[in-house]
Amino acid sequence: LSAMLEDTENWLYEELSLTQDPVV
């Protein structure tokens, strides 16, 4: 389950990075 959540977080991060520049 943790692996699935990690993949989801990675996917969300990639989606967000494509739509907007990271603030960090």
Swiss-Prot record:
UniProt keyword Translocase, yes or no: no
A Gene Ontology biological process term: response to unfolded protein
Signal in keyword set: no
Tissue/organ expression: Expressed at high levels in testis and at much lower levels in brain. In testis, expressed mainly in germ cells. Widespread in brain with highest expression in cerebellum and medulla oblongata. Also expressed in renal medulla of water-restricted animals.
Subcellular location: Cytoplasm; Nucleus
Induction comment: By heat shock.
Residues bearing PTM Phosphothreonine: 19
Biological role: Possesses chaperone activity in vitro where it inhibits aggregation of citrate synthase.
Subunit structure of this chain's protein: Homodimer. In the testis, forms a complex with p53 at 32.5 degrees Celsius which is scrotal temperature but not at 37 or 42 degrees Celsius.
Family statement: Belongs to the heat shock protein 70 family.
Protein's recorded name: Heat shock 70 kDa protein 4L
Organism per entry: Rattus norvegicus (Rat)
